[in-house]
Amino acid sequence: MSKSYKTPGVYVEEIPKLPQSVADVPTAIPGFVGYTEFASSNSDQEVSDLLKEPIKIGSLLEYERCFGKAPKLALSPKGDFDHKYVLYDSIRLFYDNGGGVCYIVSIGNYSQTSFAPEAFMDGLKKLEDIDEVTLLVLPDAATCLEASDLASV
């Protein structure tokens, strides 16, 4: 049955014969690797079942439930502070700027005293199998590793 047009003239209707060539999939999905307060899928923070496992999250609230919050800052009388762990702030800013889903790989907690590039490499290897991840973000690498170790990551 033909369509009823309101004005006279020539109308062209294109009928697609091929399926859509570009898939509708989200792009720019980041994979964050760094240190978290804890890594647990339930309220028992002693169990680290999410440690070194890529977890897909969709909000800051989900992140806080699985990985905790930012570390407490310790200010000195001079006004200096030592803030090595910036993953939480990076995630917070990601969602403050309209971020959607992302993947998190926790490679340890805030009690770490020594940092090795291998921990970050292990986290990156966990993200290799996830096709959705198109951006790699390692904010803690810049603050925890020595400059000479950054090149190896």
Regions inferred by a protein language model and the residue ranges of each:
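Surface-exposed assembly/interface segments
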Residues: 1-153
